[in-house]
């Protein structure tokens, strides 16, 4: 399969589409945790109860269509190959926990903006993932899916506590709202160490690209709410919206300051990273993330011309181990992965430049 066709098939909407403020906000995510009323939580339920949840979703929702979202398809974790599960995780469509659940499943929309995880930490986890800064659109879609499911499922709900969940931190609205942000300006100007504690004071948490316990590779940070009880869904989304909007403003100011005060140094950093990506024959994940962040910053500041700004979103995912092995058609040793990663990046950059040259020639 050619890289062009592989990318077309592999990319989710949030990776290839542009959204509001997408130079800084890569994606907006809403996740709702829900449970069946008369079935024990996943930590305590029987195999029969777990199977019945999957079966109910297959009967009522798989193959069905929801307006503005499209048709859903059920993927059972027990039927998916380890590599397929890893790719779904790398695309942020399922969690690492779900890949290990013997009775896990995922109901996925056609454009992959909506994924409904089954038998993870909770019976149901509705996720809506949109490109750019679109928390309001994401919560609207999540509520639409939630109402659709509730037509067939009686949720565990208490008048005082709200939606009941396996983890006490999710009780209440069951809502986790998050934005994935590219913040190289704030990192390079050494402001993130000051900003993160301030964000934590507001009841929000800052994590890496793959959530809890992950490192902020490539200057990509995930900011989400911590509290779900005692606040309405609207308040949670509004609070995160407000903090994200301030971060966007601060990041833009930091980038402008860098460009004005350290232009040569910044250009040198950007073009060195571009040179590495364009010419390397082996490259590890960590160096890839650093170089992609530099190049994306260069694109956004107009230092590098002729490259799509979505290249960071694409290559941060396509160069993960699961995708590399899927593209190569089998398992790879670490050094083989590093070589395959370098080849994929070089070919992707070449495709981009060739497409832009053709556009210029046709004008």
Swiss-Prot record:
Motif (RDXXRA motif of the pArg binding pocket involved in allosteric regulation): 337-342
Gene Ontology biological-process annotations: phosphocreatine biosynthetic process
Keyword Transferase assigned: yes
Description of activity control: Appears to be allosterically activated by the binding of pArg-containing polypeptides to the pArg-binding pocket localized in the C-terminal domain of McsB.
Coiled coil: none
UniProt domain Phosphagen kinase C-terminal: residue ranges: 24-254
Pfam family, one: ATP-gua_Ptrans
UniProt keyword terms in alphabetical order: Allosteric enzyme, ATP-binding, Kinase, Nucleotide-binding, Transferase
GO molecular function: ATP binding; creatine kinase activity; protein kinase activity
Name of the top EC class for this enzyme: transferase
Catalytic activity entry: L-arginyl-[protein] + ATP = N(omega)-phospho-L-arginyl-[protein] + ADP + H(+)
Residue positions binding ATP: 27-31, 92, 125, 176-180, 207-212
Function: Catalyzes the specific phosphorylation of arginine residues in a large number of proteins. Is part of the bacterial stress response system. Protein arginine phosphorylation has a physiologically important role and is involved in the regulation of many critical cellular processes, such as protein homeostasis, motility, competence, and stringent and stress responses, by regulating gene expression and protein activity.
Family: Belongs to the ATP:guanido phosphotransferase family.
Protein name per Swiss-Prot or TrEMBL: Protein-arginine kinase
Gene: mcsB
